């Protein structure tokens, strides 16, 4: 809870107390008046003073109210949240500075046809193509279409493209009241865009603002990134180019967020251990709510599959650290202007952003390092350990244990039952005996038995991923 909210609640409490006090004094005044009237008719006896009775009758009600108010304040103050971030959490959403793109900049800084961006071409769609029925028209009063052909082709696009365009139109009207989004090109059936183009599949749009103010285009590109377009390019001073993944692309679902098995975590002993060999109960280097390095216990694996091929984002820092992680995974990003930490999807991290990296020169503290390069690679195997802190330091880079949902605090709250279950299990003496007996009976390390126990998504994580589409707004999900 922030200071303004606490101050407001205490102000309300003070005002309530004042009103109750005034009410009591008014009641006392009425009692005095009645007492004087009665004293003129009958003499005052030595029985209990009516003012004391009134005060006694009033006090429990005021005490009860104050008790309830204090309980409310305690409940609000004890909700889980990171003191330095993230940008989106359970409480009031923090305003985030949005920086316009510069001319020729693309987000992400990958080839448009890579899996980490809009993905490969799937083939030209014309009116006779079977896939033409998958294109949908967009009619929205907040969006203007140039439609030079006069055929309505510019209104045709994939469902995903339509979805992102509607979100962008709302952002444009909020950013510049009275200005609308202008679509100059969408699906192209006349092949005006060269040999290869996502315009031919209805997966790309060329946009501008209705007032044609070129000074707005850098911010327009940034708003397109925030709206969820998979690849945005400030390609020209006259317009912005945006594209999306195919509706049939398996990469859209992002059912998990993981690291590679060969990536390493640091144990409490100081040794480095590959994530593919981690076991439940290992204590690994993590990050607490204040951004400090701490050791935290691994309580489960949300996903673990050593054979699955996956596309990863690689972040290279100026200190030599390299983090390989799936696009939907949350990464801690340091905001030097606001001196705060945000949790950002890996494929939204850009060059010149800052991530937290373990600095051996300062005794293992987490220090910001600049991202020099962002790339996309294919690797075999995925591992997603969950620590009690909800964070983990992998290859010396601090990251979240969560993915898909943009709110670190909400994701951490959602896994609270698993943390509680892990705590209850640790209290069972039989479990410790069982573990010790297994260690004595088997000469193989504990990690091998763990590897055999789980292959794939954890049932609880899988349930949360399925529910998210029904309970969370789309802007909070990695789509």
From Swiss-Prot:
<protein>
    <recommendedName>
        <fullName>Protein hedgehog</fullName>
        <ecNumber>3.1.-.-</ecNumber>
    </recommendedName>
</protein>
<dbReference type="GO" id="GO:0007224">
    <property type="term" value="P:smoothened signaling pathway"/>
</dbReference>
<feature type="site" description="Essential for auto-cleavage">
    <location>
        <position position="329"/>
    </location>
</feature>
<dbReference type="GO" id="GO:0001708">
    <property type="term" value="P:cell fate specification"/>
</dbReference>
<dbReference type="GO" id="GO:0048731">
    <property type="term" value="P:system development"/>
</dbReference>
<dbReference type="InterPro" id="IPR009045">
    <property type="entry name" value="Hedgehog_sig/DD-Pept_Zn-bd_sf"/>
</dbReference>
<feature type="binding site">
    <location>
        <position position="185"/>
    </location>
    <ligand>
        <name>Ca(2+) 2</name>
    </ligand>
</feature>
<feature type="binding site">
    <location>
        <position position="149"/>
    </location>
    <ligand>
        <name>Ca(2+) 2</name>
    </ligand>
</feature>
<feature type="lipid moiety-binding region" description="N-palmitoyl cysteine">
    <location>
        <position position="84"/>
    </location>
</feature>
<feature type="binding site">
    <location>
        <position position="148"/>
    </location>
    <ligand>
        <name>Ca(2+) 1</name>
    </ligand>
</feature>
<keyword id="KW-0449">Lipoprotein</keyword>
<comment type="subunit">
    <text>Interacts with shf.</text>
</comment>
<keyword id="KW-0564">Palmitate</keyword>
<dbReference type="GO" id="GO:0097264">
    <property type="term" value="P:self proteolysis"/>
</dbReference>
<dbReference type="GO" id="GO:0009653">
    <property type="term" value="P:anatomical structure morphogenesis"/>
</dbReference>
<keyword id="KW-1003">Cell membrane</keyword>
<keyword id="KW-0217">Developmental protein</keyword>
<feature type="binding site">
    <location>
        <position position="154"/>
    </location>
    <ligand>
        <name>Ca(2+) 1</name>
    </ligand>
</feature>
<keyword id="KW-0732">Signal</keyword>
<keyword id="KW-0709">Segmentation polarity protein</keyword>
<dbReference type="GO" id="GO:0016015">
    <property type="term" value="F:morphogen activity"/>
</dbReference>
<keyword id="KW-0472">Membrane</keyword>
<feature type="propeptide">
    <location>
        <begin position="20"/>
        <end position="83"/>
    </location>
</feature>
<comment type="similarity">
    <text>Belongs to the hedgehog family.</text>
</comment>
<keyword id="KW-0378">Hydrolase</keyword>
<keyword id="KW-0504">Morphogen</keyword>
<keyword id="KW-0539">Nucleus</keyword>
<keyword id="KW-0645">Protease</keyword>
<dbReference type="GO" id="GO:0005634">
    <property type="term" value="C:nucleus"/>
</dbReference>
<dbReference type="InterPro" id="IPR000320">
    <property type="entry name" value="Hedgehog_signalling_dom"/>
</dbReference>
<feature type="binding site">
    <location>
        <position position="188"/>
    </location>
    <ligand>
        <name>Ca(2+) 2</name>
    </ligand>
</feature>
<dbReference type="Pfam" id="PF01079">
    <property type="entry name" value="Hint"/>
</dbReference>
<dbReference type="InterPro" id="IPR003586">
    <property type="entry name" value="Hint_dom_C"/>
</dbReference>
<dbReference type="GO" id="GO:0005113">
    <property type="term" value="F:patched binding"/>
</dbReference>
<dbReference type="GO" id="GO:0005737">
    <property type="term" value="C:cytoplasm"/>
</dbReference>
<dbReference type="Pfam" id="PF01085">
    <property type="entry name" value="HH_signal"/>
</dbReference>
<dbReference type="InterPro" id="IPR003587">
    <property type="entry name" value="Hint_dom_N"/>
</dbReference>
<dbReference type="GO" id="GO:0005509">
    <property type="term" value="F:calcium ion binding"/>
</dbReference>
<dbReference type="GO" id="GO:0010468">
    <property type="term" value="P:regulation of gene expression"/>
</dbReference>
<dbReference type="InterPro" id="IPR001657">
    <property type="entry name" value="Hedgehog"/>
</dbReference>
<dbReference type="InterPro" id="IPR001767">
    <property type="entry name" value="Hedgehog_Hint"/>
</dbReference>
<feature type="lipid moiety-binding region" description="Cholesterol glycine ester">
    <location>
        <position position="257"/>
    </location>
</feature>
